[in-house]
Amino acid sequence: PKMTEFIASNGPWSQLVDQKNVELKKIFSEKEEKLTNDLSIIPLRVPHRDEYSETVGFKIIGPKKSALFIPDIDKWGKWDKSIIKLITQVDYAFLDGTFYDAQEINNRDISEIPHPFIIESLKLFEDLNKLNRNKIYFIHLNHTNPANNKKSKAYKLIISKGLNVAQEGSNFEL
């Protein structure tokens, strides 16, 4: 809802609305939206910086498979949902992997750039069975994230734990 108002009230986006180039449709957290006959989304509000709009992830439901898409979140423990439970309910989980660990951000205050570190996520997900760990793909990696490099210790650790780092150009059937 806040994003709808922001776009409609601020140029250059408001021009698209005024000229009817786009039609804004409000979506609401946890209310399923049918996009086509066999594809729907469920927005999931997540705690993250909300200067201009609410931040949401999505559960995406296709004709055969489903996915969880959470590219931005402050920390898993701040969410009123169980990320563990959500992972077990989908076929793929595309999750915030912005930063690998605190060393990557040097002396910056993590509260200014909040994201779960991949090493925190690895610890949180370690009790998932192999099938559920293998559903997880870290996405949204910052350019400084060592997991971007397949030869790095960071990348190899993620893979050794049974999780994945998403690769550009990959396709996932829904």
Task: List each model region and its residues.
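Cap/insert and terminal regions of metallo-dependent hydrolase folds
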Residues: 66, 74-171
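Generic hydrophobic secondary-structure signal
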Residues: 3, 7, 39-46, 58-60, ...
